Amino acid sequence: MTIAPTTLLLFAATALAELVGCYLPYLWLRKGGSMWLLLPTALSLAVFVWLLSLHPEASGRVYAAYGGVYIASALLWLWWVDGVTPTRWDLLGAACCLLGMAVIMFSPRSA
């Protein structure tokens, strides 16, 4: 299906925007960061919402499928940003979520 790479890239960009938008307030609230971090937070979360709106599918289907990509992306964040290696159980869970995302987004639909 030709839409798959575009959909997956859009989901990945959406997850990055959401993760950044959630991580910046964490830096402010828990790590002593500046309150000015809330400005890029707002921008990042606005980009997140805009990216979710670009999918041609029904919004509920997009949100459900996006959840699987978000989980996998959050585990990559755990590894790359937090420096914590995901366990095999983390990876198995993410694989199950990504399989669910693929079923939701790429299964045949009747008109």
Curated annotation (Swiss-Prot):
Keywords: Cell inner membrane, Cell membrane, Membrane, Transmembrane, Transmembrane helix. It is found in: Cell inner membrane. It is a multi-pass membrane protein. InterPro entries: UPF0060. Pfam families: UPF0060 (PF02694). The chain crosses the membrane at residues 8-28, 32-52, 64-84, 91-111. Belongs to the UPF0060 family. HAMAP family: UPF0060. This is UPF0060 membrane protein XCV3198. It comes from Xanthomonas euvesicatoria pv. vesicatoria (strain 85-10).
